Amino acid sequence: MNLVTSKPNVLLNPLFAQLGENRHVLVGFSGGLDSTVLLHLLVCLRQQLIPELNIRAIHIHHGLNPQADSWVKHCMQQCDQWKIELKVVRVNIDPRQNGIEAAARTARYQAFSANLAAKEVLLTAQHLDDQCETFLLALKRGSGPAGLSAMAAKMPFAHSQLLRPLLAFSREILENYAQAQQLQWIEDDSNQDDRFDRNFLRLNVLPILNQRWPHFAQATARSAGLCAEQEQLLDELLAENLQQLQGPDRSLSIDGLLQASMAKRAAILRRWLASLGAPMPSQSQLQRLWLEVAMARQDAEPQLMIGTRQVRRFRQHLYLLMPLAEITTNYLPWATVKAAPNSSIIPLLPEPLWLPADLGVLRFVSAGGQAVRPAAVGEEISVRFGLQGDIKIVGRHHSRQSKKVWQELGIPPWQRERIPLLYFGEQLIAAAGVFVTQAGQANENEPCWHLDWDKPLRLG
């Protein structure tokens, strides 16, 4: 292959600088112009400057184009020629919610994340024209500074980082480079279909803008960079506020938000949602979150969906919940208590019980957890869901209705039906991790069992 001469170092040197100390890279390789140039540059880096550079490529087969199989063949041949390991991943696209472009992108980056090795960084080949398109699409959506920041040249991704080393260079520069190096690449005919927003901009809008203002793409990139700076500044200024308003469970204080201006409150809410992995909410969603959830009447149990997450309120705090698996049974038999070896009356601890709906594991341990009386030999142990009736718990003199018990103990409504209830026969012994009933209380100076709930980090 041709080595890069001094002239194309305009591309090679920035790539070398951005790689830094990284020596393991995974490259998103479609076989098109942009990713072919990026992969070629990396191979040249390996030959000229970084012989220890480990390069892997990943090709995503979306199954959307009749030529997709031939593209795989092209990528395999190219990687074989350049002695690069290639991973081909087939994905399924569901365009029903956000359209085919967004669905394909989501599937692509999920595949990148799933295949990124421990020491690898991900490299993708977006260029200056792509950045301009991203900025204009954000402008069309009415985005604020976060959206108008467009794409970052370097950002956290999965357990590692995503680098976009070609972001400062136009497609024209990449095409000139590819022709000078006699590279071969594929052309996706769907790129000529201007029903897709990006293609519409690329084919019908940007040529006119660039003809009128030749440096339009560079100017939009500068604006995107300035928006990114503003977002970074806000992140730094609001980090302490966000930390002060969050509880140990990552819930957000409504009373604290009430002290902030509308603009500051919206900025804090966005950062709270982002810190928990929620998609960026629209202005309308933020308004609904505040008015319909935070400011709902006190006896209400308001909720709002943001993406697949649910925002709920409890005791003047906002909570962001992951999708919760449904509990399809209210009764789980655990064990019939057996006698320990060489004894007819000493009960043997049952094996751990795996709970449904991703609720974790219940087990009895030698120490720690909740101390409860031992079950008798022959007694049936079960786990149930859904607390009902009047309950007498340890430390209280009188029985209380189940709803009152949950309220007094500060358990949010959405968690109450997901807390395992331990029964010996028909006697409620304990709510795992929450309380022990008087019927389940261990007697002093007598052996007891210790109930331990190994639960997920977040119940919801």
Curated annotation (Swiss-Prot):
It comes from Yersinia pestis. The gene is tilS. Its EC number is 6.3.4.19. It is found in: Cytoplasm. It is an enzyme of class 6 (ligase). One of its GO terms (biological process) is tRNA modification. Keywords: ATP-binding, Cytoplasm, Ligase, Nucleotide-binding, tRNA processing. ATP binds at residues 30-35. Belongs to the tRNA(Ile)-lysidine synthase family. Transmembrane segments: none annotated. InterPro entries: Lysidine-tRNA-synth_C (IPR012796), Rossmann-like_a/b/a_fold (IPR014729), TilS/TtcA_N (IPR011063), tRNA_Ile_lys_synt (IPR012094), tRNA_Ile_lys_synt_N (IPR012795), tRNA_Ile_lys_synt_subst-bd (IPR015262). CDD domains: TilS_N. The N-terminal region contains the highly conserved SGGXDS motif, predicted to be a P-loop motif involved in ATP binding. It catalyses: cytidine(34) in tRNA(Ile2) + L-lysine + ATP = lysidine(34) in tRNA(Ile2) + AMP + diphosphate + H(+). The keyword Nucleotide-binding applies. GO terms for cellular component: cytoplasm. GO terms for molecular function: ATP binding; tRNA(Ile)-lysidine synthase activity. This is tRNA(Ile)-lysidine synthase.
